[in-house]
C-alpha cells in the first residue's frame, strides 16, 4: 500500500499545480482585458473633453477679433460685482478702448410680424453635448459645414433580387493556348482483348548469337531402369606372395591314426654277451 502512496500524492500535486497555473493565466488575461478597457475609456474621455473645448473656443473665433476676446470671455465667465468700483471712473481712459461687454437685456418688446419661413438648416455634426452653457452676443454662430466624414462600414447584405433577363449570346472566344502537360494518371483497368490480327509477313533470319553463359545445373532426373548384366572381365594377374603371417594358435589334438602296415623283418642281430636269461618279447599281432 505504501508503494502506491507516493505516486498518488505526486499526481495530485501535479494536477493542483497545473490548475493553479491555468487559474493564474485566466486572472492575468482578465486583468489585461480590464486594463485595455480602462485605457480605451480614458482615451475616449480625453477625446470628448478636447472636442468640447475646441468647440467652445471655435464659437468665439469667427465673430470676435483678438482685441475683443477678453470681452467675450468676460461674458462667459462673469466677474463678481465686488470687482468693479462703485462709481464709473472711465471718462479719461475711455479713448481708444475696445467696446465693453454687452449690457443687460432690455424689457421684452412687442410681438413682431410673422416672418417668412427660413431655409432648411444644415445637418449638425455628431458629437457630445457641451458641459458648459454660456450666452454669446448675437445668438448662435453659423459655423461652416465641416469636411465629409469617413466612409461608414458596409451595410448588411440585402435580399436577393429578381433574376434578370437572359443576355444575348456572346461572340465565340478564341481558342485558348494549349495547356501544360498534366501529371501522368494512374494505370487504367485492363481492357477487353482485341480481335485477332492478320498474319504478319515472315521476318528476316536472325543472326547467330554468341555462346551464352553456362546455365544453372538442372534438377536430378528420375532413376533409369536396370541395365543388362555386363560381360565377365579378364582373369586378374596373380598377386605376389605376401609375407609369412604369424604362427597360429595350437590346434586341437588330432584323433589317433590307423595302424600302419607291418614293417619288413629286421636283420638278425649280433650275438650278445651272455647274461641273465631274458625271455624274448612277444611278437606283435597282425591286425
Curated annotation (Swiss-Prot):
Q: Where is the composition biased (Gly residues)?
A: 206-215
* Presence of keyword Signal: yes
Q: The Collagen-like domain covers which part of the protein?
A: 145-200, 215-273
Q: Which portions of the chain have biased composition (kind: Pro residues)?
A: 98-107
- Give the region (Disordered) as residue ranges: 95-287
The signal peptide here is 1-19
Q: Which Gene3D superfamilies match?
A: 6-Phosphogluconate Dehydrogenase, domain 3
Cross-referenced InterPro entries:
Col_cuticle_N, Collagen
GO CC annotations on file: nucleus
Q: Name one Pfam family in it.
A: Collagen
Q: Which domain of life is it from?
A: Eukaryota
Ordered alphabetically, the record's keywords are: Disulfide bond, Nucleus, Repeat, Signal
Q: In its UniProt record, which GO terms are filed under biological process?
A: collagen and cuticulin-based cuticle development
Q: Name one GO molecular function term.
A: structural constituent of cuticle
Biased composition, class Low complexity, residue ranges:
184-205, 238-252
Changes seen on gene knockout:
RNAi-mediated knockdown causes hypodermal or cuticular rupture, typically in the anterior body region. Abnormal gap between the outer layer of hypodermis and muscle and the internal organs, perhaps due to defects in cuticle integrity.
Q: Its family?
A: Belongs to the cuticular collagen family.
Subunit: Collagen polypeptide chains are complexed within the cuticle by disulfide bonds and other types of covalent cross-links.
User: What is the role of this chain?
Assistant: Probable cuticular collagen-like protein. Nematode cuticles are composed largely of collagen-like proteins. The cuticle functions both as an exoskeleton and as a barrier to protect the worm from its environment. Acts downstream of the Wnt signaling pathway, perhaps in the formation of the adult cuticle.
- For this entry, the protein name equals Cuticle collagen 38
Amino acid at each position: 500500500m505504501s508503494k502506491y502512496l507516493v505516486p498518488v500524492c505526486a499526481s495530485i500535486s501535479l494536477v493542483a499545480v497545473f490548475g493553479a497555473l491555468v487559474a493564474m493565466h485566466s486572472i492575468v488575461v482578465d486583468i489585461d482585458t480590464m486594463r485595455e478597457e480602462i485605457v480605451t475609456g480614458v482615451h475616449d474621455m480625453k477625446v470628448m473633453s478636447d472636442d468640447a473645448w475646441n468647440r467652445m473656443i471655435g464659437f468665439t473665433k469667427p465673430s470676435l477679433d483678438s482685441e475683443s476676446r477678453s470681452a467675450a470671455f468676460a461674458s462667459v465667465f462673469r466677474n463678481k460685482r465686488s470687482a468693479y468700483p462703485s462709481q464709473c471712473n472711465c471718462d479719461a481712459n475711455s479713448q481708444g478702448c475696445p467696446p465693453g461687454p454687452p449690457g443687460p437685456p432690455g424689457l421684452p418688446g412687442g410681438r413682431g410680424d410673422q416672418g417668412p419661413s427660413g431655409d432648411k438648416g444644415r445637418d449638425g455634426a455628431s458629437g457630445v453635448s457641451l458641459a458648459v452653457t454660456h450666452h454669446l452676443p448675437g445668438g448662435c454662430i453659423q459655423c461652416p459645414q465641416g469636411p465629409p466624414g469617413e466612409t461608414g462600414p458596409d451595410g448588411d447584405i440585402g435580399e436577393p433580387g429578381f433574376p434578370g433577363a437572359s443576355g444575348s449570346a456572346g461572340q465565340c472566344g478564341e481558342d485558348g493556348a494549349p495547356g501544360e502537360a498534366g501529371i501522368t494518371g494512374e494505370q487504367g483497368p485492363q481492357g477487353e482483348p482485341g480481335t485477332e490480327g492478320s498474319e504478319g509477313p515472315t521476318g528476316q533470319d536472325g543472326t547467330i548469337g554468341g555462346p551464352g553463359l553456362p546455365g544453372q545445373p538442372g534438377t536430378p532426373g528420375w532413376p533409369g531402369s536396370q541395365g543388362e548384366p555386363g560381360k565377365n572381365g579378364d582373369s586378374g594377374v596373380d598377386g605376389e606372395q605376401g609375407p609369412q603371417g604369424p604362427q597360429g594358435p595350437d590346434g586341437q589334438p588330432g584323433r589317433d591314426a590307423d595302424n600302419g602296415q607291418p614293417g619288413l623283418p629286421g636283420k638278425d642281430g649280433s650275438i650278445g654277451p651272455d647274461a641273465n636269461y631274458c625271455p624274448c618279447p612277444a611278437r606283435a599281432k597282425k591286425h
